[in-house]
Amino acid sequence: MLYSENDKRKHESYRIPLFGSEEESTSIPKYVLKKEPMEPRIAYQLVKDQLMDEGNARQNLATFCQTYMEKEAEILMAETLEKNAIDKSEYPQTAELENRCVNILADLWNAPKEMSYLGTSTVGSSEACMLGGLAMKFRWRNNAEKRGLDIQAKRPNLIISSGYQVCWEKFCVYWDVDMRVVPMDKEHLSLDVEKVFELVDEYTIGIVGILGITYTGKFDDIALLDEKVEAYNEANEHQLVIHIDGASGAMFTPFVNPELPWDFRLKNVVSINTSGHKYGLVYPGVGWILWKDKEYLPKELIFEVSYLGGSMPTMAINFSRSASQIIGQYYNFLRYGFEGYREIHEKTKKTALYLSKTVEKSGYFEIINDGSNLPIVCYKLKDDLDVEWTLYDLADQLLMKGWQVPAYPLPADLSDTIIQRFVCRADLGYNVAEEFAADFADALHNLEHARVLYHDKERNDSYGFTH
């Protein structure tokens, strides 16, 4: 083929190796928009290189979020990235898939057939918690006005354990609600139900029960809480309700412990949220919230939106977002079915129990959560242990092998207790877990045979957790 000078310039860029390009030999603008465009292959590589030192997401044992999906799911989600989940009239079949997901969850959570349950997808459990909190606040306000209570006399309040996820603090700040916290102690590493009612008054909008505390993986005793709430409701005109923050547990427990009473089978549990991108096995981010009956979602929170020629009811804080995660959730429901989810979660639980025993056998640690209810392994150094290293040192050692395993203080009254926790997800197979166990043993050996420079025994670093 013969080339002219123009042809040479036209095709020159394709003859230059990627790392011989002009863009790779100069510093790219980082905080202002660059003037000229560049080839897509170069832009791709530059962005990929910027992310290179973040580590392997599958070795991130700090996160609950799903880090693996099947290729078919990835293709399907990539093919639907452009669909706007809010455009119900434009994408009616996508809306139908969302509706099916809500119905599947209602069945999974034992919503009474005689009631009119309803629900919606969200960006994640944080948004779902906000919606659940708003519904409780508005319903409390409506009922308080009917009882003649002066709703301006003091702020409404929400009761939750100190193991709460930060979205609840945000909810209370954003919507002017007093958050009344039941502190955890060494005897109660979940909600102390007896102390709940020391905080209840006529301005209480509801109580949050947590099915899988982010710090430890433990469950609040929802059945006992429901029993106590029922006794309170029988004796008082003001009626309490329970919202379940099931960000982690609500997509795990129905498959591995279906007999555990925590869901809509309990009379006073009126709403539940969960994260599809945790044990729903979908990439971030998708969440869900369901109400047991329409009476628990005040009508003033439901908007009829006229959009692109259609009218639709909506209850959300976010608006435009891709429908791909909703479609990914439906794919998983269709692909796995009940037995598929059960098998996956049982294997994940088996992995957690194996790692828990590995940690315990080392002799250094006291197990706080062994992964039998939720596959979260949580532990602390034994109180009588005389070592020069801390859990923060252990976290640093594991990070050298690529494993991200956080160490952090427990909240509030237990802030002097430092714990470490790792999350077992579906993609942490038994063979990979064996590799982690070997690296864990090596890390302990290195710490025991290294000279550790003096530092404070434990530093009260704080870690934020998000849905």
Swiss-Prot record:
Reported cofactor(s): pyridoxal 5'-phosphate
Keyword Lyase: yes
GO process annotations (BP): glutamate catabolic process
N6-(pyridoxal phosphate)lysine modified-residue sites: K278
EC number of the protein: 4.1.1.15
Catalytic activity: L-glutamate + H(+) = 4-aminobutanoate + CO2
Pfam families to which the protein is assigned, alphabetical: Pyridoxal_deC
Keyword annotations from UniProtKB, A to Z: Decarboxylase, Lyase, Pyridoxal phosphate
Recorded GO MF terms: aromatic-L-amino-acid decarboxylase activity; glutamate decarboxylase activity; pyridoxal phosphate binding
Record carries keyword Lyase: yes
InterPro entries: Glutamate_decarboxylase, PyrdxlP-dep_de-COase, PyrdxlP-dep_Trfase, PyrdxlP-dep_Trfase_major
Coiled-coil features, chain-numbered ranges: none
Taxonomy, superkingdom: Bacteria
Any one annotated GO CC term: cytosol
Annotated NCBIfam families: Glu-decarb-GAD
Family per record: Belongs to the group II decarboxylase family.
This protein's name: Probable glutamate decarboxylase gamma
Source organism per UniProt: Listeria innocua serovar 6a (strain ATCC BAA-680 / CLIP 11262)
